[in-house]
Amino acid sequence: MQILPIVISLITILFLIASILFFSKIKLGIIQIDTFWIVTMIGAIVLIVCRCVSIQDLKESFFSRTSVNPIKILVLFLSLSSLSIYLDELGMFSHLATFFANRFSKNQYVLFFGFYAMISLLTIFTSNDIIILTFTPFLCVFCKENRINPLPYLMMEFVAANTWSSILIIGNPTNIYLSSFYNLDFMTYFMSMAIPTISASITGLLILFLIFHKSLKEPLQHKYEKENKIKKIPLVFGLLHLVGCTVLLSVSSYLNLPMWLIAMAFSLSLMLFVILYSAAEKENQIVPLLKRLPWNLIPFVLSMFVLVLALKNSGLTQILSQTFESWDQVITFGYSGLLCANLINNIPMAVLYSSLLEHASLKAVYASILASNIAAYITPIGALAGIMFMNLTEKHDVKISFVTFVKYGLLIGLPSATAGFLALRFLP
């Protein structure tokens, strides 16, 4: 077993954790840059320079014609993100939130469970990151204006978005990444993950209610909010693209079309519509849309892929894989996935586990996917969504400390994950 690639990878991961906790952004004039991808990119470059990964290895991995090509996976994720971000740019999600709050604010119980249902439904067909970015500011402002405790609603939002994101392949980049490695089609994935996701979600909701039911008893005097108007033509086109893409993805295996190609086609079609509509209306809708795409995931995922290649070449992943496969695979990969994601973040965890799962059972793959989603609400390190969530709450003067987040995360996350793993373990 080679030691150098393990040492370099370990140092990179330690600096990654430090960057997430202590210096998540750096300022260059008026521009703020995330540091997480810079750290991993430096680590990847060092590994290449030290010849822990050969150029031939990179060519074979990045330009392979299989579905495990990381570039194809990134195209799939960015394309799907563009469809959701466009609807958010139009104001659809904030409109729905305001509409719901104005009509169902009779008491906090109705509001709490109603928001949970809406956030869960929207997460299933869009993306957990988009929901977090949209609903966190809304809930902070809503709770402040109505003088109610924001913590139950914010924790509910985060738990709902990061549990229901497991049910469809499009809900999280980790779902896309791991399922692509094992050629799982849309419907096969859904049929296998539906019951574990529902089990985890029901468990999480019950625990949320037990923790916060006293706070929800407080009276609510809702202040009516004006609902923003949405232009109908862009909204219709945006929804048609999202629904059409989701439907075609669900039957992609029968059409013998790769999912990344379907998503890219819908994304390019939407971009063309936005450009033409913007020109006709003398507006600029394309630039805000392009700015909000998570471009920093490209160097991050590719760099982590280099780290995993180096660890694979060192022989470490083979040793770990053989060790994990000798035990109960659902439990081993599930709980180790939770721990790993909260040490190095869920995207690097997914990249690492793609190597560990090479000879594992399909249930182990699904357990790893479920872990990569639920890990997000155990600690803020577990996912990029956690970092965004903490930054957004701080900007809106809602204080949720790291310790508070972890306390509720462990209380809710571990039982939810256990329910999901057990459902997966005993399913035929």
PLM features: residue spans?
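Hydrophobic transmembrane alpha-helices of multi-pass small-molecule transporters
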Residues: M1-I85, I195-S201, L205-N313, Y408-P428
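Alpha-helical transmembrane segments of multi-pass membrane proteins
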Residues: Q108-S120, R147-W164, D328-L339, H359-P380, ...
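Re-entrant/interfacial helical elements at transmembrane boundaries that shape
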Residues: L96, I130-V141, L154, L168-Y182, ...
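Residue-level recognition of transmembrane alpha-helices
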Residues: Y116, P137, F158, G171, ...
